[in-house]
Regions:
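Short acidic/histidine-rich motifs immediately flanking catalytic phosphotransfer sites
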Residues: 385-390, 616-622, 642-646
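Rossmann-fold NAD(P) dinucleotide-binding segment
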Residues: 622, 626, 630-653
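ATP-dependent carboxylate/acyl-activation modules
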Residues: 1-230, 235-390, 404-408, 412-420, ...
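Generic hydrophobic/aromatic pocket-lining and core-packing "Φ" positions
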Residues: 342, 441, 610, 636-637
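Rossmann-fold NAD(P)-binding glycine/threonine-rich loop
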Residues: 440-441, 653-666
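Glycine-rich, highly charged phosphate/nucleotide-binding loops
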Residues: 599-617, 626-633
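A short helix->loop->beta-strand "cap" motif at the edges of active sites that frequently abuts
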Residues: 423-426, 578, 642-648
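Redox-cofactor binding/interface segments in oxidoreductases and associated redox assembly factors
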Residues: 83, 330, 393, 624-625, ...
Length: 666
């Protein structure tokens, strides 16, 4: 999930620094009708302190953190203050976790009483380790407002109510709303006031709020927020006729973590010591944004280890422990499959026994898969259950992940934990498919014959979640099927089809060392056009069916492994014309790339320009886009601008939400 909550401290620093800097999203930027007060925020951070530390060590750490806050923020000793935990806790006031109108001595004592101690908020318990201290702002209740900006598939939505504060009530029922469609400008201040501020009598406050909302939305878009709520938002008018001050007293926010490459430097700068404390000698670049775990969900040592592994690889490794005493553990390949398996377990009434949630995907190495599997097996075998435990190693049909390679890592971990698995009475159920799936399943089946642990192995002949009811005793083995049968000696069998592909075999490929702008000679273009014309009459796809048996694609990016896999699949299916027409690689000149068609070599042209590739192969109406998350928006926009392209398959993960929504709207 890309939308990650941030601390109130960080959210207010972002807003304070960029409120007057972010470029407007309106057609014209109005003159601000409000004054921005000086930002004063002090953080008391004890996140490195553990509850298992001695009382003296915890007390010393608390005093050191309080002293540091006082040293960096001398204003703490001369003003009335507000103190509260800053750990993504909702309704802190109603939970007794808010101190108002206190001096620094009272704040320190209040923090000492609660720091590194467990508290219950509703049904959730957690340890308080981070506190926010800021000046107390006295104000009448009638100047408290509520504003929220949130993102939806079709655009952004601004909500506003003229009544804010603790007793705001049902926001959805009473809020006025303003929709901002994707790629559309924000309305002018008068329109904002007419849509959202009709219940405010004061013209001064209405003007201040209208221009503040314009600025707030500018920051929201500029910094890739996905949610931003201020309650209460206070407008303080002055007796001398100066601009009213707009103060955001309480704030909750989420950022799009996948947009860190785009906005990460801005997030860091607003939180640097030079900006926060105004000292010229301080570091001008702040720390990377911290995305804390939800209250009551501190990362365990194992979760932190997998998170560290995930950060060091291009693959995806995720682990969340739900119930360490649960008897159902999963090791699922793919984010979508992890949801499907969890839903299947919950649908059978075993949600309370589900011990973990996570996934491994993106072609992790054998070593990475071993470390991931070892971590899960270690957690699983720490405690015993009378009825034993179940390990579900599941997954759909992999695109590029080598099943045999990842299974080598899992098998290595299973062998290492053999005695613990036997002692814990663990049964293992496997369902997987994809590249080299037979080799991987064969190795897993052979392991089951020698390990001393029951291992049932199933392949693509079995429904993806069929092993779940079998593992949980809700279905018999006969209902699931006989399981994996090693029926094929090799995955690319001999074929009676022609040994050379149809269109590429007739291509007159240009010498890549020559300076000709086009790779494919007219004869090749004519062959491609003839192939398209021959199938046009009976192969024209319906508007709702993007693919047919004769669909041809352009592969964007230098991905020879993926292309070879597609050609192998074509050959197995006895296609006469390969599904890959050509490749596009913008960072090199036109050339050709060697591939195999069955056991024969063939050449595919590689173009530096997408437009040139499309013109040379007018029958190709699909693009498989391997561009990275940083460049996929620009490249996909170009693809969608070509009339012949009907389908674009985006492989990149971690595309910023705002980019994805713009692509959907094109």
């Amino acid at each position: 999930m890309s939308a990650k909550a941030i601390r109130e401290y960080d959210g207010k620093l972002l807003l304070a620094h960029y409120l007057q800097q972010s470029p407007t999203m309106a057609t014209t930027q109005p003159t601000a009708a409000f004054a921005q007060p000086q930002t004063r925020l002090a953080q008391v951070n004890l996140s490195e302190v553990n509850t298992t530390d001695s009382g003296d060590k915890i007390s010393a750490a608390v005093e050191a953190a309080l002293s540091r806050a006082e040293r960096l923020n001398p204003w703490l000793t001369s003003t009335k203050l507000v103190a509260k935990p800053d750990q993504l806790i909702k309704r802190r006031g109603k939970s007794g976790l808010l101190l108002l109108n206190a001096d620094w001595a009272q704040v320190k004592e209040w923090i000492r009483e609660r720091a590194v101690k467990e508290v219950a908020v509703g049904e959730i318990s957690g340890v308080l380790k981070t506190f926010l201290v800021e000046p107390f702002v006295a104000h009448p209740a009638e100047v408290e407002y509520y504003v929220c900006i949130q993102s939806h598939r079709d655009g952004d939505e601004i909500l506003f109510t003229h009544e804010g504060g603790v007793e705001i009530g049902d926001v959805d029922a009473k809020a006025l709303r303003l929709q901002v469609p994707i790629a559309q400008p924000l309305p002018d201040s008068e329109s904002i006031a007419g849509k959202l501020l009709a219940d405010i009598a004061s013209a001064t406050q209405r003007a201040a709020l209208a221009t503040f909302i314009e600025r707030l939305y500018a920051v929201y878009v500029d910094l890739n927020f996905t949610y931003l709520e201020i309650n209460p938002l206070v407008v303080l008018e002055t007796a001398d006729g100066a601009l009213p001050q707009v103060v955001y007293l309480d704030l909750a926010a989420k950022l799009d973590q996948t947009a860190e490459f785009e906005s990460g430097d801005k997030w860091a700068k607003a939180r640097s010591d030079a900006v926060v404390y105004g000292t010229a000698a301080a570091e001008a670049v702040g720390p990377a944004m911290d995305f804390p775990a939800p209250f009551g969900r501190e990362l365990s040592r194992e979760e932190a280890y997998i998170q560290e592994l995930d950060a060091k690889t291009g693959a995806s490794l995720k682990l969340t422990i739900l119930n360490k005493e649960g008897r159902i553990w999963t090791m699922v390949a793919g984010g979508g499959a992890s949801v499907v398996y969890s839903d299947a377990i919950a649908a059978l009434g075993f949600a309370g026994e589900l011990a973990n949630y996570g996934e491994y995907s993106g072609a992790p190495s054998e070593a990475q898969t071993y470390e991931y599997a070892k971590t899960i097996l270690d957690l699983m075998t720490r405690t015993q259950r009378a009825e034993g435990k179940v390990l579900i190693i599941g997954g759909g049909i992999a695109n590029f992940t080598n099943v045999a390679t990842t299974f080598k890592g899992i098998i290595r971990a299973l062998k290492e934990y053999r005695q613990a698995l036997i002692a814990t009475n663990v049964r293992v159920f496997v369902r997987r498919a994809g590249p080299n799936w037979q080799e991987g399943l064969r190795a897993m089946r052979e392991l089951g014959e020698t390990l001393g642990v029951e291992i049932r192995v199933y392949g693509p002949e079995t429904h993806v979640t069929a092993i779940v009811p079998l593992a949980l005793g809700q279905a018999s083995p006969a209902a699931v099927g006989a399981g994996f049968r090693d029926s094929l000696a090799k995955q690319i069998p001999d074929s009676t089809a022609a040994s050379s592909p149809g269109t590429p075999a007739t291509m007159d490929i240009a010498d890549p060392l020559q300076s000709r702008p086009a790779v494919v000679a007219p004869a090749a273009a004519a062959a491609a056009a003839a192939a398209a014309a021959a199938t046009a009459a009976d192969d024209k796809p319906s508007w709702y069916a993007p693919f047919t048996a004769n669909t041809r694609a352009i592969v964007y990016g230098m991905q020879p492994r993926a292309v070879q896999g597609m050609l192998d699949f074509d050959f197995i299916c006895k296609r006469t014309v390969p599904s890959v027409a050509c490749m596009v690689y913008p960072f090199g000149g036109n050339h050709v790339q060697k591939f195999y068609w069955g056991t024969q070599e063939t050449l595919l042209p590689v173009f530096a320009s997408l437009a040139e590739a499309a013109s040379q192969f007018p029958d190709a109406d699909v693009v498989v886009n391997f561009a990275s998350c940083r460049s996929v928006f620009a490249s996909t926009s170009e693809m969608l601008g070509l009339p012949q392209i009907r389908t674009v398959a985006i492989i990149a993960e971690g595309v910023p939400e705002r980019h994805a929504r713009k692509l959907i709207s094109l």
